[in-house]
C-alpha cells in the first residue's frame, strides 16, 4: 500500500523529526514516503498534491499548531477520495482519542510513540488482518492505552533520521531537531510531557556518532528536543564535553533547561570550556506567582 507520512510545520525552517523516524522504521517493509508542508500553505494546494500522489494511506503528525488545519485537510482529502485511509498520531491526539475519532474525518488514531505500532498497523492493513494493537484505535475499536514505549536501542539500530540523503542539500537552511532522551521528570499540569512517566536516554555511543556525522554537514542550528536537558547532570556533562571537543565553526546547539536545578558542575564547565557562540539556552519560568505554580505543579526554586 502506498503510504505518505506528512505534517504541517509552523515554518519551513522547522524539520519534523517524527516523520523521519516513522520513515526509517517502515521504509524497508512498506512503500512509504514522507513530505512536509507548512501552516501558511494553501490547503487546497496541499490536498491536490497529496491526491495526485495516489496514496492509499496518509498519516499525519498532529501538534497544537496544526491540529485545526489538519482537521480541514482530512475532510478535503476524504471528499476527493473516500477510500483513502487516514491515520493521526502525535502528542495532540494521543490523549483525546474519542474527540478525534468522533469529530475528524479519519480512520485511525495512534496514541503514544509510533515507531513500532505504525509499522504494525501498516502490516495489518497491507495483509487485511484484524487490527488489535495496543495504542491503535479506530471508530469501531477504541484502545485507550498508550502504545508501549519504544526501546531506544531499536531506534539506534535504524538508519539515522538526521542524515537522510534528501536532507543533506538544505541542512544549512533548516533547524535540525535532535533528541538525546525521551520523557520528562516533571508533572506540570498544563503540559502533555508530564503524562509521560520517567526518563529514557539514548546511549552515549550512538549520540556521539550522530553528532560527529552531523559536524561533517553544513547544518547551522541543532535544537535538542529533550524536555529538560539538565535533568541528569552526568548525561548533560558527557554531551557537552563531546560537543566542545568536536564542534564545527558556524554551528550552534540549542537546549531547553531548568534553571533552578542547574547543577553547579554544568555552570562551571560551560564557563570554563564553552566556545564562544556555540550554545543557546531556553530557560522556562512559566510563572513567578507561587500559588499558581503550586496549583499547576510547576515546582521551581527562585
Model-derived regions: residue spans:
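Residue-level recognition of beta-strand->loop/alpha-helix junctions
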Residues: 7, 34-38, 61, 195, ...
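A structural micro-motif
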Residues: 1, 30, 84-85, 250-251, ...
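Mobile, glycine- and charge-enriched loop segments
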Residues: 15-36, 75, 170-176, 181, ...
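Radical SAM [4Fe-4S] cluster-binding motif and immediate context
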Residues: 159-302
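Alpha-helical structural signal in soluble globular domains
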Residues: 25-29, 76-80, 103-104, 124, ...
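Glycine-rich beta-alpha loop elements in corrinoid/cobalamin-binding modules
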Residues: 2, 18, 25-26, 33-149
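A short, flexible N-terminal coil/short beta segment enriched in small residues
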Residues: 1-17
Amino acid at each position: 500500500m502506498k503510504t505518505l507520512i506528512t505534517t504541517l510545520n509552523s515554518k519551513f525552517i522547522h524539520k519534523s523529526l517524527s516523520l523521519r523516524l516513522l520513515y526509517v522504521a517502515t521504509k524497508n517493509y512498506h512503500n512509504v514516503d514522507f513530505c512536509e508542508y507548512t501552516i501558511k500553505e494553501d490547503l487546497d494546494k496541499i490536498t491536490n498534491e497529496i491526491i495526485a500522489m495516489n496514496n492509499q494511506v496518509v498519516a499525519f503528525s498532529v501538534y497544537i499548531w496544526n491540529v485545526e488545519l489538519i482537521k480541514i485537510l482530512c475532510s478535503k482529502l476524504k471528499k476527493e477520495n473516500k477510500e483513502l485511509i487516514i491515520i493521526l498520531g502525535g502528542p495532540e491526539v494521543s490523549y483525546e482519542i474519542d474527540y478525534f475519532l468522533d469529530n475528524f474525518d479519519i480512520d485511525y488514531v495512534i496514541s503514544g510513540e509510533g515507531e513500532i505500532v505504525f509499522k504494525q498497523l501498516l502490516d495489518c492493513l497491507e495483509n487485511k488482518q484484524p487490527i488489535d494493537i495496543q495504542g491503535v484505535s479506530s471508530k469501531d475499536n477504541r484502545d485507550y492505552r498508550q502504545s508501549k514505549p519504544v526501546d531506544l536501542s531499536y531506534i539506534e539500530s535504524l538508519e539515522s533520521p538526521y542524515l537522510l540523503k534528501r536532507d543533506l542539500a538544505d541542512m544549512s537552511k533548516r533547524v535540525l531537531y535532535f533528541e538525546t532522551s525521551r520523557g520528562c521528570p516533571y508533572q506540570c499540569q498544563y503540559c502533555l510531557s508530564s503524562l509521560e512517566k520517567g526518563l529514557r536516554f539514548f546511549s552515549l555511543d550512538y549520540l556521539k556518532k550522530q553528532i560527529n556525522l552531523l559536524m561533517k554537514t553544513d547544518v547551522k542550528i541543532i535544537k535538542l528536543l529533550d524536555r529538560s536537558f539538565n535533568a541528569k547532570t552526568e548525561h548533560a556533562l558527557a554531551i557537552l564535553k563531546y560537543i566542545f571537543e568536536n564542534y564545527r565553526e558556524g554551528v550552534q546547539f540549542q537546549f531547553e533547561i531548568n534553571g533552578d536545578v542547574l547543577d553547579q558542575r554544568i555552570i562551571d564547565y560551560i564557563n570554563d570550556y564553552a566556545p564562544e557562540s556555540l550554545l543557546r539556552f531556553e530557560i522556562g519560568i512559566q510563572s513567578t506567582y507561587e500559588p499558581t505554580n503550586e496549583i499547576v505543579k510547576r515546582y521551581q526554586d527562585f
